[in-house]
């Protein structure tokens, strides 16, 4: 272009973007953690390893700023939902939740029933390598991610959240309801997992886990999950007020 020198072009290229203008551009998220872990990769892995146990993972919360945050896990084969209470929703806290689950179950039982973790692409689950690595620095699980905006790909867990919400409704102050610690969450889990499920032949997830996966049941029972008699199961917000 006439009148523009090479020096002018160099100045233009090297000139920094103003802070005001830079704010208009969203930093591109690092998606390297998805490599080999997409839903397509998950389907391929399941196709080659049809007998491995799958656990679906997510977070449930009402107040994104103040929490509390519930890290949920559903053991697909037994239909049982487990959960860990957090005060923050970060990649580090979710990794610590998996560390705790491994500690509760023990390495052998964990690696058996949490062979695969299927979750969504929320930023709190982006530390794939850390989540996959056990406290002994060896692989403890394989993490895979649903496609964007496809929560139905882990619909089994999403459906269980509906039952969780009977006790912990959206829009409520969860701490005011009584969800103040893990013991309170264990009470919620005990009731949800003691409710009979049609797909399980009228048995509860805890019944099925006890009968078919007793090693898993023993670990969860020792942590604080207990069977509730069917006529005493409460799936209402007043449960923790009792």
Question: Where are the model-predicted features located?
Answer:
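Secondary-structure boundary/capping micro-motif
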Residues: 1-176, 180-190, 195-197, 205-242
């Amino acid at each position: 272009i006439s009148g523009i020198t090479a020096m002018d072009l160099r100045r233009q290229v090297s000139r920094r973007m103003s802070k005001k203008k830079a704010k208009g551009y969203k930093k591109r998220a690092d998606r390297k953690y998805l490599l080999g872990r997409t839903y397509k990769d998950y389907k391929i892995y399941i196709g080659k390893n049809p007998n491995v146990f799958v656990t679906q993972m997510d977070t449930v919360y009402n107040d994104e700023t103040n929490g509390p945050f519930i890290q949920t896990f559903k053991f697909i084969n037994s239909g049982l939902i487990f959960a860990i209470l957090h005060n923050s929703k970060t990649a580090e806290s979710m990794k610590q939740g998996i560390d705790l689950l491994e500690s509760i179950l023990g390495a052998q039982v964990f690696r058996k029933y949490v062979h695969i973790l299927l979750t969504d692409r929320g930023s709190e689950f982006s530390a794939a390598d850390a989540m996959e690595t056990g406290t002994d620095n060896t692989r403890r699980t394989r993490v895979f991610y649903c496609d964007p905006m496809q929560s139905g790909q882990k619909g089994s867990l999403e459906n269980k959240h509906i039952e969780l919400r009977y006790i912990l409704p959206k829009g409520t102050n969860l701490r005011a309801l009584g969800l103040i610690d893990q013991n309170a969450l264990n009470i919620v889990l005990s009731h949800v997992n003691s409710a009979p499920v049609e797909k399980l032949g009228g048995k509860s997830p805890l019944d099925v886990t006890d009968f078919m996966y007793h090693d898993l049941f023993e670990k969860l029972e020792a942590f604080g999950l207990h069977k509730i008699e069917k006529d005493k199961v409460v799936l209402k917000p007043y449960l923790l007020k009792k």
